[in-house]
Curated annotation (Swiss-Prot):
Protein name: UPF0339 protein YegP
Signal peptide: none
Source taxon at top rank: Bacteria
Pfam families: DUF1508
Transmembrane segments: none
Record's keyword terms, sorted: Repeat
Length: 110
């Protein structure tokens, strides 16, 4: 099964999206947006930037866990991954975002 985006509204009326893999696991979480239209633009940005290796910023947290940020051409963070125990599992996460990030399916939960 292919991946999809889920768009939601927080209790303080901000918007965020997540990218889900075909197995339902969240593989990328966006920042908060003040409008639904801005969140939808963020989804479009994931679609255009996720296939490009150079858009992934690989990081190590202070606790030694690995994660990545997906960035737009202007270097703004579009979304961040979960924390991974190993650098290899982070690479698997990046591959999953590349494979699912061009999905046209959006489940609107707002």
């Amino acid at each position: 099964m292919a991946g999809w985006f889920e768009l939601s509204k927080s209790s303080d009326s901000q918007f965020r999206f997540v990218l889900k893999a075909g197995n339902g696991e969240t593989i990328l979480t966006s920042e908060l947006y003040t409008s639904k239209a801005s969140a939808e633009k963020g989804i479009a940005s994931v679609r255009s930037n996720s296939p490009q290796e150079e858009r992934y910023e690989k990081k190590t947290a202070s606790n030694g866990k690995f994660y990545f940020n997906l960035k737009a051409a202007n270097h703004q963070i579009i979304g961040s991954s979960q924390m991974y125990a190993t650098a290899q599992s982070r690479e698997t996460g990046i591959a999953s975002v590349k494979a699912n990030g061009t999905s046209q399916t959006v489940k609107d939960n707002t």
